[in-house]
C-alpha cells in the first residue's frame, strides 16, 4: 500500500519527520516499509518561460516556431510540436544542457539542434516529459503569475511516497487516515469537510435481499453533475500512489478509498432501471466489469442489481460497464456500503478478480465510516462537479454499541515483563482511538473503536500495549527467558517437529489419557505400573503402550460415522521393572519411554463415482512409515525384517565410535483380531509404534546438497537370481555401495518360480549412473556392471539372470 506524505498532512497539518526516522518509527509500530519513492528532482535548467510569438514551421505542417522568453537578454527560438502551444502561454522550458528523464527510464540531454531545417535552442515540455504524469496531449500551461526564468522545480511540491506492507489483521491502516491515526500520538486529526446529510429509510428504492452479504447500504442521488477532468491537486494525489485519473466523479471515489479506507462506487442514474438498487446473492448471469472483461456470476456471489434485475456491479469487487459513469452522465447514484468479508473474498477468488475495493472488504472495513465517507464524497462532488443532492437513503443497520474489553494491568505486566501503571496503559491505548470507560485497580474497561475489527480479546489489547510502548523499550528479563534442555538440538523440540512431519503426511493428532483401564493395559504388557491412589475406577494403571488409547479413539469415531481414519500420537509409555518392588522405590520401579504410534483404517479414497472403494492395507501403512523416515533422512540406513508371522520390525543402523550397531526402531503390523474385538472394531486397522528417542538420535537435520551432473545420465536394468533367505534390501545396498557413480537403485520387478533345485527368486533392479566430471563411456559402464556382478555373487550368492 502506497502512502503519500503530503497527503498524510491533510490529516496531520503539523506533521514533520525525516524520512529515515519515519520509516524506523513505522517499522517499530509493526508496519514494514518495503520501498521509499521521492518525487523526482527536476534539473534546475528547466525554467519557467513565456511564449512571445508563434508562427508555422515552413517545412512541417505539425510543427510551430516559437519565440520564448526565459528571463535572458535574448529570447530562445524553439521548435515545438504540441497542438496547444500559443502566444502568451507560460510554459516549462528545458534549456541547453538540461537533462530530462522519461517514465521508461530513458534520459535526454537538451542541446541546440536543427529540426526540419530550423534552429531550436531548447524544448517546451509536456507533463510526461517531466515525469509528472502520463499526459502527452500538449505542453503544460503554468500559472501566469509565475516568475519568468525561475527554476520550475521551485514551484513543485516535493513529496515522499512510502510502500508499506500491511498484515492481513490490520485493515484499519489501509488508508492515509489509518496511518495518520498511528502517527498522531494523540494529536487531533483534521478530517475533510462533509456535506450535511440526513439519511432517510430507503423504502423500495434500496432492497437488501441478503442481509448477511450486505448488512448496511447507503445511497445518495445527485442531479445535474458535470463530468470533467479533476483539478490538478486531486490528480496529483492519485498519481502519487500510482493511480491514473479518469474523471472527477471516479477520481473522488478512488480518493475516498485511499484517504478514508471506505470503498465507494458511483452509478449513472440513467442506466439504473427505475433508479432502484437491490443487493442479491442469487443471480446467475454474465456481467462486463469496468475492466472490459466478462465474468460469470453464480449463486452465492453478492451483486448489485437495478430495478429490472440486471447486474450493475459485483458487490464489493468492481462496478459494471452497463452502469458506468461517462462524459454524458448528469445524474449519479453514490454507493457507500458494508459487505461481508468472506463473501467478497469468495467472489473475488472464484472470479479471479481482485481490486482495491475487494482487498479492503475482504479484511473488514469500519462500519461507522460508511456514512462519514459518503458525506465527505458528496461535499467533494458538489465542489468539483456541481449538482444538487436529491436524497440520501439507507437500508439495514450497523451495531449501535462498541465492543467492550477488559484489560488487567497485572497480567499485562506479567506477560510483557514491564512495570507499567494503569494510567500509562490508558494513555497508550487512547492514542489510537480506544476509550477507557471504567478504571479500577484490578482492570481497565475499554471501548474498542469500530475500525479495529482485529481486537476481540484481552490478549489483543496486551499486544497493542506492547506495540505502542515499543518492543525495543521492554528490558530483557532472565525470568522471561525460556531455557530448553541442553541436549536439544535443531529442531528445538523434536516431538513437535515430528508432529509437523506427520501432519504433512495427512495424519491427525490425538491426545489420550496416560491413565487407562487395567484390562486394556493387560493386552499390551504384563509389567504394569499401578497408580497408588487412582482418581477413579478405570484409571488405575499407566499405559504400557499407546495402542489401547488409539484403538479406543478409532472405535469411538467409527460409532459416530467416521470409518476412514489416519491418526497418530506422540506421548510417553510406562512399564514396570519386575526386579524392583514398586511400593519400596516407586520412582525406580518403572521405565518411561516416548513413543510414536500411527494407525490407518477404512477406505483408501473418498467414496466417488470414479474411484474404487478399496480399503487400506498393510502397504499403505508401510508407505507412510517409509515417507516419514525419508523426511527424517533415516530411510537409507533402515531395514525392514520379519518380527513375527504377522508383524515386521524396522531396524536402523547407527555408527558410533567407529562401530556399527543395529537398533530396533519399532514394529508395523495389522492389529490382531483379539484387540479389535476387545475395542468393538469390525474393520481392519494397521498400526506402527516407533521409538521417538531413537528417531531423534538417527535424525539428520540437513542433507548435503549435490548438484545434478552436467553430463548425460545413464540408466541400466539388471536382474539377479538370489538364493532363498537373501532380502532384496541387502541386494540393493550391495549394488549401491559398489561404485560412487551409482546414484539410485530401485526394485522394479520380483518374480518367483519353482525350479528343479528348489524355489527360484528373481529381483530386477533399475540403476541410475552419473559422473559429475565427464561423460560416461561404454567401457566405464561395463566395468561398473562387472563389479556389481562379482560383488553380488561373492557376497550374496546372487547371479545375473540369463535371458
Curated annotation (Swiss-Prot):
Alphabetical GO biological process terms: phenylalanyl-tRNA aminoacylation
Cofactor: Mg(2+)
Disulfide-linked positions: none
GO molecular function, one term: tRNA binding
Reaction it catalyzes: tRNA(Phe) + L-phenylalanine + ATP = L-phenylalanyl-tRNA(Phe) + AMP + diphosphate + H(+)
Principal subcellular localisation of the protein: cytoplasm
UniProt cross-references to Pfam families, sorted A to Z: B3_4, B5, FDX-ACB, tRNA_bind, tRNA_synthFbeta
Ranges where the FDX-ACB domain occurs: 709-801
Entries under InterPro entries matching the protein: aa-tRNA-synth_II/BPL/LPL, B3/B4_tRNA-bd, DNA-bd_dom_put_sf, Fdx_antiC-bd, Fdx_antiC-bd_sf, NA-bd_OB-fold, Phe-tRNA-ligase_IIc_bsu, Phe-tRNA-ligase_IIc_bsu_bact
Keywords of this entry: Aminoacyl-tRNA synthetase, ATP-binding, Cytoplasm, Ligase, Magnesium, Metal-binding, Nucleotide-binding, Protein biosynthesis, RNA-binding, tRNA-binding
Entry EC number(s): 6.1.1.20
Cofactor note: Binds 2 magnesium ions per tetramer.
GO cellular component terms listed in the entry, alphabetical order: phenylalanine-tRNA ligase complex
List of residues binding Mg(2+): 454, 460, 463-464
Enzyme superclass (EC): ligase
Ranges for domain tRNA-binding: 40-153
Domain B5 intervals: 400-476
Cell compartments where the protein resides: Cytoplasm
Record carries keyword Hydrolase: no
Similarity comment: family membership: Belongs to the phenylalanyl-tRNA synthetase beta subunit family. Type 1 subfamily.
Subunit structure: Tetramer of two alpha and two beta subunits.
Protein name per its UniProtKB record: Phenylalanine--tRNA ligase beta subunit
Species of the source: Chlorobium chlorochromatii (strain CaD3)
Classification lineage: Bacteria, Pseudomonadati, Chlorobiota, Chlorobiia, Chlorobiales
Gene that specifies this protein: pheT
